[in-house]
From Swiss-Prot:
Residues 1-24 are annotated as: Disordered. Signal peptide: none annotated. This is Large ribosomal subunit protein bL27. The keyword Ribonucleoprotein applies. NCBIfam families: L27 (TIGR00062). PANTHER family: LARGE RIBOSOMAL SUBUNIT PROTEIN BL27M (PTHR15893:SF0), RIBOSOMAL PROTEIN L27 (PTHR15893). GO terms for molecular function: structural constituent of ribosome.
Length: 89
């Protein structure tokens, strides 16, 4: 049995920062114009009504409203933002 501690290699001990991708605002959530909806690589989800697409394929809201995930056809998912319903009070 060794009674000396093994010395750790100084070449280890690093890792890269994760990209923090994914959905940031879910269906039914109220968003403001400019809010990021999805961070993604490639167009896994396409922009729908009132949604813009950034240079890195990030989807963001163009108007204040409510998020809705939809299927444009069988395989093409899209996210849209619809104006929030104004309650009569």
């Amino acid at each position: 049995m060794a009674h000396k501690k093994g010395t750790g290699s100084t070449r280890n001990g690093r890792d890269s920062r994760s990209q923090r991708l994914g959905v940031k605002r879910y269906g039914g959530q109220v968003v403001k114009a400019g809010n990021i909806l999805i961070r993604q690589r490639g167009t896994k989800v396409h922009p729908g009504k009132n949604v813009g697409r950034g240079g890195d394929d990030t989807l963001f809201a163009l108007i204040d409203g409510v998020v809705k995930f939809e299927y444009k056809d069988k395989s093409r998912r899209q996210v849209s933002v619809y104006p929030a319903e104004v309650s009569a009070s």
